[in-house]
Swiss-Prot record:
Organism classification: Bacteria, Bacillati, Bacillota, Bacilli, Lactobacillales
Recorded GO MF terms: 3'-tRNA processing endoribonuclease activity; zinc ion binding
EC numbers for this chain: 3.1.26.11
Annotated catalysed reactions: Endonucleolytic cleavage of RNA, removing extra 3' nucleotides from tRNA precursor, generating 3' termini of tRNAs. A 3'-hydroxy group is left at the tRNA terminus and a 5'-phosphoryl group is left at the trailer molecule
Pfam families linked: Lactamase_B
Positions annotated to bind Zn(2+) 1: 63, 65, 145, 216
Keyword flag Cytoplasm: no
Protein name listed in UniProt: Ribonuclease Z
Similarity comment: family membership: Belongs to the RNase Z family.
Enzyme class at the top of the EC tree: hydrolase
Organism of derivation: Streptococcus pneumoniae serotype 2 (strain D39 / NCTC 7466)
Keywords of the record: Endonuclease, Hydrolase, Metal-binding, Nuclease, tRNA processing, Zinc
Amino acid sequence: MDIQFLGTGAGQPSKARNVSSLALKLLDEINEVWLFDCGEGTQNRILETTIRPRKVSKIFITHLHGDHIFGLPGFLSSRAFQANEEQTDLEIYGPQGIKSFVLTSLRVSGSRLPYRIHFHEFDQDSLGKILETDKFTVYAEELDHTIFCVGYRVMQKDLEGTLDAEKLKAAGVPFGPLFGKIKNGQDLVLEDGTEIKAADYISAPRPGKIITILGDTRKTGASVRLAVNADVLVHESTYGKGDEKIARNHGHSTNMQAAQVAVEAGAKRLLLNHISARFLSKDISKLKKDAATIFENVHVVKDLEEVEI
């Protein structure tokens, strides 16, 4: 499981940072990629990665500001031109209005897609659990921005315990099909009468990962709730230390406020995202250094960077 950042800038693209988009790569878990936001130029960034567009099965939009959605029509259209690849349907989750934006863009441009898009729109009254599969659950909660904006909490369900092969061998269980039966929870009786209780040879379930991905927001309690015990918290850092007033006026957060959220939530790792173009390389190190005085395990991400979860 990895996150690859396709756009880490704020508001408008710069030479170093594209506008908002990241890919949650779940290839080992479910052979899918989930996209979070799709700012202008997202498909160009994808061309610089190993991501195959048809593997993108779900797109989660945080809000309808242009730097988070203007890349959708282009990506959806280009996804239709994947030669020699099976066309797969796509799901888009986002605030009310995302369906109208996408369909209007496709209609006006005369674009026809050989796959279906299934839209899941929500508003303030229909948040909470928005998706549940056999391996993942996704929650959405409203943040505090200048327009309706949400954050997402992606929870991997507990993983099966591992089989203790050495212990089984010591108990006289021959390697082969019996191992598979025990792994599936089946109790056995060996030829010599030895009873094998599957539970004695399988470790306890391992907790799944928790990934919190926030849209644009002021510091708010919703951010903390979404990030409780998160393995990774992706939080915007449009402004730096001392800019709390201007950040609030524009519906954004500082690096220090993001660090405070991480502390209050008990998150394990903080990734600062949505970085303003006014921060030069030397200022980026200061963003991290200042935030680390509050929350030590912090990192400022950059475009195309891949982070293992």
